């Protein structure tokens, strides 16, 4: 509770709180995502940061934080998809464990761990496999919340274009979207068919709390193209 209070105070003091009058377009997007997924409206902030990112923090009263670069880089639909993804974390009650996973990801950086007292404890946690298991769970949680975003947007290409901008940065405007999707399918095919490719992909992703953007595109395409997405909609009468 104390930590959650600190998080809220930090962003109230250093970021812009989104309200019906302050950034009303973002507030409207949050309303759409929350109403669709059946989640009580959390507080949302926009923080000055050049990294295209967003995250959800807190537990009992979670907050969503959008980096300013994300709001500037993405169009309205893509921004809604990101907000829906974050609301998906709240709906699925991921926030506590995601916070722990991000902390472990941070501490796994050797240069950071060397500066922190008790780094031997960090090494012990890692050796016990706790870190690997939690980060693996976090990556699956991210994929499940991409599906939450899909349920809000009902258009896999909005998710795909968002991932393209995450992968390509400012260069994304020069990237052919259809070829990017083809790359995602090729990645998934190689991952499924080649043990060596699967090994290297898993090794490279093992220390991260998020799957690679291409991986996320491949997963959302598979979910929609195999009919699983339609089954979820039908089950909920959509």
Across the structure, where does each feature detected by a protein language model lie?
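Short pre-active-site segment immediately N-terminal to the catalytic Zn-binding motif
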Residues: 21, 65-81, 133-139
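Residue-level signature of catalytic and energy-coupling elements of molecular machines
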Residues: 30, 66, 145, 212
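Active-site His/Glu-centered metal-binding helix of metallohydrolases
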Residues: 74, 83-92, 144, 148
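Catalytic Zn2+-binding segment of zinc metalloproteases
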Residues: 87-106, 113-115
């Amino acid at each position: 509770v104390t930590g959650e209070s600190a998080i809220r105070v930090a962003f109230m003091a250093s970021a812009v709180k989104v309200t019906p009058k302050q950034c009303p377009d973002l507030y409207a997007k949050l309303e759409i995502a929350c109403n669709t997924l059946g989640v009580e409206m959390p507080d949302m902030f926009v923080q000055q940061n050049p990294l295209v990112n967003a995250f959800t923090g807190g537990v009992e009263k979670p907050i969503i934080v959008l980096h300013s670069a994300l709001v500037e880089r993405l169009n309205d639909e893509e921004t809604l998809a990101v907000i829906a993804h974050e609301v998906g974390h709240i709906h699925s009650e991921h926030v506590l464990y995601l916070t722990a996973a991000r902390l472990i990801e941070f501490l796994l950086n050797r240069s950071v761990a060397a500066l922190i007292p008790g780094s031997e404890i960090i090494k012990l946690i890692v050796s016990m496999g706790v870190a690997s298991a939690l980060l693996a769970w976090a990556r699956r949680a991210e994929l499940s919340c991409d599906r939450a975003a899909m349920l809000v947007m009902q258009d896999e290409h909005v998710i795909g274009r968002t991932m393209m901008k995450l992968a390509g940065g400012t260069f994304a405007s020069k990237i052919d979207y259809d070829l990017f999707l083809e790359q995602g399918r090729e990645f998934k095919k190689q991952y499924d068919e080649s043990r060596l490719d699967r090994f290297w992909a898993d090794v490279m992703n093992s220390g991260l709390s998020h799957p690679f953007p291409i991986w996320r595109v491949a997963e959302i395409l598979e979910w929609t193209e195999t009919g699983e997405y339609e089954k979820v909609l039908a089950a909920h009468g959509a």
